[in-house]
Amino acid sequence: MLGPQVWSSVRQGLSRSLSRNVGVWASGEGKKVDIAGIYPPVTTPFTATAEVDYGKLEENLHKLGTFPFRGFVVQGSNGEFPFLTSSERLEVVSRVRQAMPKNRLLLAGSGCESTQATVEMTVSMAQVGADAAMVVTPCYYRGRMSSAALIHHYTKVADLSPIPVVLYSVPANTGLDLPVDAVVTLSQHPNIVGMKDSGGDVTRIGLIVHKTRKQDFQVLAGSAGFLMASYALGAVGGVCALANVLGAQVCQLERLCCTGQWEDAQKLQHRLIEPNAAVTRRFGIPGLKKIMDWFGYYGGPCRAPLQELSPAEEEALRMDFTSNGWL
């Protein structure tokens, strides 16, 4: 059961989030944030001694801020959030809020394993500047994470969150796909505005769009590898790791899809598939950070137990970008 401190934090977070005037949901008003657009999931830079390098974080954000992104995602999978302390997670959100352009949205990953911890983290992230909370599925006890359990979890979080909630399904990391029936039920909640689906099943994305079409609910593709297909099926944007290095190109793909230039979109999408796979399922965060170094950003090391790429892996990573004309 949530204690008095949490309830107090909820009220404080609600007051602060409303005062920032970003058009988010407020109890009784029915207002929601429009999350359509492209978001890079920001990496967390570390020093050689594994401390968070906030200076490099701000440098990366200043460079990324030159592209027409809708906003930024922090403390998602690419932010290595499972390896950060609670205070580090909040400090990262705060620093990003201060460094990013004021007209961009900040989606902060606030998911934890328990419902109570998720509520507390969500409220705290609202207080340090998040516009919306992106909440990953709890998964440690995934054998018991039925649709009913997940609906209960997300409903409680959304009820108590002072900012809108975005559902986050990433089965490659959690071993758990948020069931479509649960998504449909949750889409009816006035404080759940959308979903990031990283599973890669575009038929599932199309089905979710179809079944939630009567709700004020938006779907974001979780990867640049299936961004065009997702747009064709009704998604409104994407959270794309590849946008950390090919921001202009991912935004161009968005523009081509949104203006119906499908032939040109197809050509560009083809050239993004291999690089995207390299920085996601093939080489993961170590691969993304390495290519960021090559593109003039600060990638740097990951926190243990993640390891840097081997020389052979680096060469394969380079080939995936050079063969498609990006290096």
Swiss-Prot record:
GO terms for molecular function: (4S)-4-hydroxy-2-oxoglutarate aldolase activity; (R,S)-4-hydroxy-2-oxoglutarate aldolase activity; protein homodimerization activity. Keywords: Disease variant, Lyase, Mitochondrion, Schiff base, Transit peptide. It is an enzyme of class 4 (lyase). The record marks 168 as: Involved in proton transfer during cleavage. One of its GO terms (cellular component) is mitochondrial matrix. Substrate binds at residues 77-78, 198, 222. Inhibited by divalent cations. Its EC number is 4.1.3.16. Changing residue 198 to A: 2.5-fold decrease in kcat and 4.2 fold increase in KM. It catalyses: (4S)-4-hydroxy-2-oxoglutarate = glyoxylate + pyruvate; (4R)-4-hydroxy-2-oxoglutarate = glyoxylate + pyruvate. Changing residue 196 to A: No enzymatic activity. Its main location: mitochondrion. InterPro entries: Aldolase_TIM (IPR013785), DapA-like (IPR002220), Schiff_base-form_aldolases_AS (IPR020625). GO terms for biological process: 4-hydroxyproline catabolic process; glyoxylate catabolic process; glyoxylate metabolic process; oxalate metabolic process; pyruvate biosynthetic process. Pfam families: DHDPS. It comes from the Eukaryota. The active site is at residue 196. PANTHER family: 4-HYDROXY-2-OXOGLUTARATE ALDOLASE, MITOCHONDRIAL (PTHR12128:SF66), DIHYDRODIPICOLINATE SYNTHASE (PTHR12128). Belongs to the DapA family. It is linked to Hyperoxaluria primary 3: A disorder phenotypically similar to hyperoxaluria type 1 and type 2. It is characterized by increase in urinary oxalate excretion and mild glycolic aciduria. Clinical manifestations include calcium oxalate urolithiasis, hematuria, pain, and/or urinary tract infection. Catalyzes the final step in the metabolic pathway of hydroxyproline. Homotetramer. This is 4-hydroxy-2-oxoglutarate aldolase, mitochondrial. It comes from Homo sapiens.
